[in-house]
């Protein structure tokens, strides 16, 4: 099982992830909501919801949202953000397993998993649960990362050598269009289509980029936590050097691509 399928790395990054990564990730969430083309004031299930990136955008536009995440600290961040935004009444968020949803059957217009289901130990179960909770004709949307190389590949390769269960070289499940169509179709979703979406990650310098990664990148933060502060003083600069050799000192503009798979219940 992937280390990223457990609560530990997401608990470790929760506070900084919510503070620093939201503007970048919200762009993918907005596109997912646009492509889903749900009716006005829809009911939405947000699975592996993190700090509420998609949920709170949807709620601000009138949706009623049921959300779940396996990380207690991510759920804490979600609740804090929904309260601060005056949307606590529009969202119900709880800690739980996306492979066994505590949601009623055939009740939702849309079910979303933004960069979460790809880490599930049993993706088929997660997709079947998405299908189960959707009304007939409801939309399931699954986001996953297009394989990346360069600096991110070097980072993941270095991390995977220390922490078993991390993807080596930056490869995740559902990282090609064929597997997305196959797995969503096998779960009973119809007319599955896959869209490519690209966003840019900008940093004023490599130092700024690296410092943010040390706070928000779940594999890197988990690695740092597992090896301990003393070993990290030696290991961290070596990994940084490998990544910097690819990127240079900046300013940086890094393109990241994602797949959005959409199927009909």
Name each model-derived stretch.
Residues 109-123, 146:
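A short SAM/SAH-binding and catalytic strip from SAM-dependent methyltransferases
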Residues 14-22:
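Class I SAM-dependent methyltransferase Rossmann-like catalytic core
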Residues 1-13:
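N-terminal, positively charged/glycine-rich alpha-helical extensions of SAM-dependent methyltransferases
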Residues 23-42:
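Conserved alpha-helix/loop element of class I SAM-dependent methyltransferases that forms part
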Residues 43-101, 125:
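Class I SAM-dependent methyltransferase SAM/SAH-binding core
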Residues 124-125, 131, 135-204, 220:
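Conserved catalytic/acceptor-binding region of the Class I
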Residues 99-110:
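A short acidic, Gly/Pro-enriched loop at the edge of an enzyme's catalytic core
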Residues 4-6, 24-25, 51-53, 172-265:
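Conserved Class I S-adenosyl-L-methionine
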């Amino acid at each position: 099982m992937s280390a990223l399928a457990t609560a530990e790395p997401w608990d470790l990054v929760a506070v900084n992830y919510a503070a620093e990564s939201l503007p970048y990730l919200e762009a993918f969430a907005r596109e997912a909501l646009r492509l889903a083309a749900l009716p006005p004031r829809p009911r939405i299930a947000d699975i592996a919801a993190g700090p509420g990136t998609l949920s709170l955008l949807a709620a601000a536009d009138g949706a009623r949202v049921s959300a779940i995440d396996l990380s207690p600290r991510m759920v804490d961040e979600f609740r804090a953000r929904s309260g601060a935004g005056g949307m606590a009444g529009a969202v119900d968020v709880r800690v739980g397993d996306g492979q066994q949803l505590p949601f009623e059957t055939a009740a939702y217009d849309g079910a979303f998993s933004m960069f979460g289901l790809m880490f599930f130990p049993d993706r088929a179960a997660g997709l079947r649960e998405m299908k189960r909770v959707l009304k007939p004709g409801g939309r399931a949307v699954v986001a996953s990362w297009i394989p990346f190389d360069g600096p991110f590949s070097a980072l993941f390769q270095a991390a995977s050598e220390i922490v078993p269960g991390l993807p080596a070289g930056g490869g995740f499940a559902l990282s090609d269009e064929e597997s997305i169509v196959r797995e969503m179709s096998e779960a009973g979703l119809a007319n599955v289509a896959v869209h490519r979406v690209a966003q840019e990650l900008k940093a004023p310098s490599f130092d700024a980029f690296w410092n943010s990664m040390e706070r928000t990148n779940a594999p890197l933060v988990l690695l740092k936590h597992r090896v301990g502060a003393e070993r990290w003083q030696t290991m961290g600069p070596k990994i940084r050097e490998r990544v910097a050799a690819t990127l240079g000192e900046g300013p940086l503009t890094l393109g990241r691509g994602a797949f959005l798979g959409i199927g009909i219940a």
